[in-house]
Design a protein with these regions (language model features):
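ATP/Mg2+-dependent ligation/transfer catalytic cores
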Residues: 8, 12-17, 29-31, 57-66, ...
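Conserved mixed alpha/beta catalytic, RNA-binding, or beta-rich assembly cores of soluble enzyme
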Residues: 60, 220, 227-260
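Long, well-ordered hydrophobic secondary-structure segments characteristic of membrane-embedded
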Residues: 28-59
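N-terminal, positively charged regions that mediate nucleic acid binding
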Residues: 1-38, 140
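A generic structural motif
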Residues: 12, 57-64, 129-134, 182-187, ...
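Cofactor-binding beta-sheet edge motifs in enzyme active sites
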Residues: 3-5, 9, 26, 41-47, ...
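Glycine-rich, mobile lid/loop segments that gate access to catalytic sites or pores
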Residues: 4, 8, 43-51, 71-223
Length: 260
């Protein structure tokens, strides 16, 4: 039976959105460990140089103002984007803080004098297998390992940018590996292909087919190339597509949100 799993880099626009939401959460809990946080981030290229919107609910005790949000966003972008484009410019994009106070109904349901309650009902799925050292499903584990190695290469190679995806298919005579990685215009694709093939051999046993950037050139990436939104990569964040997910995202949520 064929099995396919995909992973994405921290420079993928959806994962950048996740990172910003988690940075807001971390700052809120650092300011006050009792902060209640449910943050969503949206980022996109625009005709005026890019937009990042941070919204959701947050306790007043978290004490994060507009300047705090701006710093958080810029810190996250500095770790996940190398290159500015006309429609997403790191030095001039618009950052919009739309955080509002947490609902009093949710607050009263979560907290009382004796117990800590859940902020919502939900479905949570746990999984482990002894087929891999990570206890993850084998195909997903393979994709994830290749992605982590690719991320290191992306950070250390000046000809590569930071948006990428890795897809692995197993179950046939040969494993199929597809990598899409953002790059500079003047990159030598043939040389990159050789380097990535060498890397893949460390994580794939036996023969494999390898496709690099099957859609062609991939210069414009990150939020300049595609919109990013918190919570759109929940399968990647969990155990891959062979294991059910409950449906809730992890990022930007304090521990009273049971899916976190």
């Amino acid at each position: 039976m064929y099995k396919t799993a995909e992973t994405v880099s921290p420079g993928h626009p959806d994962k950048i959105a996740d990172l910003i939401s988690d940075y807001v959460l971390t700052e809120a809990l650092s300011n006050n460990s009792k902060s209640r946080v449910a943050v969503e981030t949206f980022l996109t290229g625009t005709t005026y140089g890019g937009l990042v919107v941070v919204g959701g609910e947050i306790s007043d005790i978290a004490k994060i103002d507009d300047k705090g949000i701006e710093k958080i966003v810029k810190d996250a972008l500095a770790k996940t984007i190398k290159t500015s484009f006309e429609d997403f410019q790191l030095d001039s994009l618009k950052i919009q803080n739309e955080l509002t106070p947490q609902s009093e109904e949710i607050r009263s349901a979560v907290e009382d004098d004796e117990d800590l309650g859940a902020g919502d009902q939900g479905i949570m799925v746990g999984y482990a297998t002894n087929e891999t050292e990570s206890f993850m499903p084998p195909t997903f584990d393979m994709s994830r390992n290749i992605q982590m190695a690719l991320w290191e290469i992306q950070n250390n190679d000046e000809k590569l940018d930071l948006d990428s995806k890795v897809q692995v298919t197993t179950g046939g005579e040969e494993t199929k590996v597809v990598i899409s990685t953002q790059h500079k215009k003047d990159i030598d694709i043939d040389e990159l292909r050789i380097n990535l093939e060498d890397m893949i051999t460390k994580y794939v046993d036996g023969k494999f087919q390898f496709d690099l950037n099957p859609s062609g050139s991939f210069v414009k990436g990150g939020p300049a190339g595609d919109t990013g939104l918190t919570g759109r990569k929940i399968v990647v964040d969990a155990y891959g597509p062979t294991v059910p997910v409950g449906g809730g995202a992890f990022s930007g949520k304090d521990p009273s949100k049971v899916d976190r």
